[in-house]
């Protein structure tokens, strides 16, 4: 419901371009019940366009993967880097983490519209900052000594990302019209995803995500964002 206006605008824009979008909404988080229902509805579609938060983007990526369709992601917040990564997390209808699926590729196109993302509640950017900051601590602990060139590049990108967020994030949260907001939002939603793409599981196989996934089993934690 919180993104209804943006979704309606997107539908109108697509129709104005002569396209015939079929709209589908998730009843749960990225859940098998929703995925099976939407897959049946989308069997004659040419592509999957996912617009929303991280779980909507995860669902769109996984749906496109299963249907062998091109995938376009449109993040409506900077709360995670889900719009850029080749990974989807699956949850139960109750919101508990069940597992993740490694996809064969990243989305074919990511559209990061500052105007859309600015409409998201400030707490979503705060969540994105926390999620992106964690990339350095996860990557440096799990793969700081790796001899793999791409992994080392991911680790160093995570360090630069951390420094950028420590400089800009407070100003960004106070002033969404500032250049600091642009740098911070792009760092959270875009750069953090590149780190995940280069480093993969080797840059996140530490306690942080395991603790997060365990906490999703508790109903009392379901109002808390990923970051």
Question: Would you name each region that the model predicts?
Answer:
Residues 147-227:
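Active-site segments that bind and position negatively charged phosphate/pyrophosphate groups
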Residues 54, 133, 209:
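Short, conserved catalytic/metal-binding motifs centered on acidic residues
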Residues 65-157:
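A glycine/threonine-rich phosphate-anchoring loop and its flanking beta-alpha core
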Residues 1-47:
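ATP/NTP phosphate-donor binding region
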Residues 4-7, 55-61, 81-84, 204:
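Short glycine/serine/threonine-rich phosphate/pyrophosphate-binding segments
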């Amino acid at each position: 419901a919180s993104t209804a206006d943006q979704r309606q605008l997107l539908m109108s824009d697509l129709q104005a371009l002569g396209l015939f979008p079929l709209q589908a909404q998730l009843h749960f988080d990225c859940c098998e019940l929703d995925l099976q229902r939407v897959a049946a509805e989308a069997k004659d579609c040419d592509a999957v366009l996912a617009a929303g938060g991280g779980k909507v983007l995860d669902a769109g990526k996984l749906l496109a993967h299963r249907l062998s369709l091109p995938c376009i992601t449109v993040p409506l917040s900077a709360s995670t880097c889900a719009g850029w990564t080749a990974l989807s997390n699956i949850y139960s209808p109750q919101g508990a983490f069940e597992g993740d699926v490694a996809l064969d590729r990243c989305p074919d196109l990511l559209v990061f519209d500052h105007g859309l993302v600015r409409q998201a509640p400030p707490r979503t950017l705060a969540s994105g900052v926390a999620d992106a900051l964690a990339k350095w601590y996860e990557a440096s602990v799990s793969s700081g000594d790796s001899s793999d060139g791409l992994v080392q590049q991911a680790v160093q990108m995570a360090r630069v990302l951390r420094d950028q967020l420590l400089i800009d994030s407070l100003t960004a949260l106070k002033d969404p019209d500032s250049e600091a907001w642009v740098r911070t939002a792009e760092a959270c939603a875009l750069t953090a995803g590149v780190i995940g793409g280069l480093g993969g599981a080797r840059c996140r196989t530490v306690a942080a995500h395991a603790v997060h996934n365990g906490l999703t089993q508790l109903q009392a934690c379901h109002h808390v964002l990923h970051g």
